[in-house]
């Protein structure tokens, strides 16, 4: 019978993961048990994806706000620190801010507006337009912001992040001054010691600040990039990708997980004879059209993956072929012609009109986004996702 199903994404239920658990063994067993339970078989080039959360949990990669405070104080001097361009998130940044504030006498908190880097809005563009201000040049004090815009709560969380962040800083024992600006060098009017908290634009922000005369500049990836008092760390990403664990502890982005994905790949090959690909994934890279939020608070979608996931898709657009190259064909003749075109396609279709609209993005970004949507971030209990048929085409 002709095959009728293409790509399938399955959430795989797993035990609750604790520090020290043998995660590769748990992942392999969970996938094989799911296959036996649901009556499907593994195939070559299936993708087994493991959420970064359980990787970090199994590694015990945690740190406290006191660890953050100690590192911030050591690297930024413990006086007045400019904290600029943080994202607006209780889970992602608020607990980090507690630790940062504990490591300083005063925090000058500079928020971008009308939204943060990933799209969480303080105010709307309509409000900016109505107020007649220029977000590219105008610097607002807290008083001016309140005068123009009043209290604005986040559409989904109901939190006034301006007040929330200011209160966190005060509770941590530091003075706080809040300003609103979109030019990094504005902060140098207040302090020359700066912690820039943006994620994907951090290298440019660092460069701008140093060129403008900043004395000390750190990014979040410079904080906890080595253990502090025996804490966890991430040598490459520091605090980037961290999440709230408890009221005084964070879970850091997983470290050194390349060996784990390769171990899972080897174990599946040994047990089934199938050569699968394996990746660790965090946030997907999709954008919410309602809230305008780009769902990528992690520094990367995938911090580790097997070699078969390097690159981008190399696909032809079926509707382009049907409407152009083979517009006079139909039925079996059309199917045969398209199948022949797929089998004859070049190794790289960059610049080929027949590939337009085929999503030329990194495979790990595409598959990681699919997996993030499949596993969810709540109580599904499926921190492993099996994707089958992703690399198949119309002829398979």
State each model region's role.
Residues 1-44, 53-396:
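Conserved mixed alpha/beta catalytic, RNA-binding, or beta-rich assembly cores of soluble enzyme
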């Amino acid at each position: 019978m002709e095959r009728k199903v293409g790509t399938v994404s399955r959430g795989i239920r797993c035990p609750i993961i604790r520090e020290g658990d043998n995660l590769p063994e748990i992942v392999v067993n969970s996938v094989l048990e799911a296959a036996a339970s649901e009556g499907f078989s593994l195939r070559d080039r299936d993708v087994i994806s493991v959420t970064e959360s359980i990787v970090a949990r199994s590694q015990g990669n945690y740190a406290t706000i006191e660890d953050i405070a100690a590192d911030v104080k050591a690297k930024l001097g413990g006086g007045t620190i400019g904290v600029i361009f943080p994202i607006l998130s209780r889970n992602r940044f608020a607990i980090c801010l507690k630790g940062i504030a504990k490591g300083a006498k005063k925090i000058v908190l500079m928020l971008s507006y009308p939204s943060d880097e990933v799209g969480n809005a303080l105010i709307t563009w309509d409000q900016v337009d109505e107020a007649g201000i220029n977000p590219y040049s105008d610097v607002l004090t807290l008083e001016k912001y309140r005068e123009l815009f009043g209290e604005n709560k986040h559409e989904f969380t109901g939190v006034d992040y301006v007040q929330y962040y200011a209160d966190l800083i005060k509770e941590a024992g530091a003075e706080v001054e809040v300003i609103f600006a979109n030019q990094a060098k504005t902060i140098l009017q207040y302090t020359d010691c700066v912690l820039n908290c943006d994620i994907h634009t951090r290298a440019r922000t660092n460069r701008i600040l140093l060129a403008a005369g900043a004395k000390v500049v750190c990014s979040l990836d410079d904080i906890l990039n080595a253990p502090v008092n025996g804490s966890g760390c991430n040598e490459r990403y520091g605090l980037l990708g961290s999440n709230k664990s408890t009221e005084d502890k964070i879970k850091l982005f997983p470290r050194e997980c390349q060996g784990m994905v390769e171990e899972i790949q080897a174990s599946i090959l040994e047990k089934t004879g199938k050569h699968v690909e394996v990746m660790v994934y965090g946030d997907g890279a999709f954008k919410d059209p309602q809230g305008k939020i780009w769902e990528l608070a992690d520094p990367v979608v995938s911090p580790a993956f097997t070699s078969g996931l390097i690159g981008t898709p190399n696909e032809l657009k079926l509707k382009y072929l049907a409407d152009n190259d083979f517009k006079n064909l139909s039925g079996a003749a059309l199917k045969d012609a398209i199948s022949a075109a797929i089998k004859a396609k070049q190794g790289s279709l960059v610049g080929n009109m027949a590939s337009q609209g085929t999503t030329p993005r990194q495979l790990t970004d595409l598959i990681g986004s699919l997996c993030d949507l499949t596993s969810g971030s709540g109580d599904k209990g499926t921190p492993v996702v099996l994707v089958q048929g992703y690399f198949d085409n119309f002829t398979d």
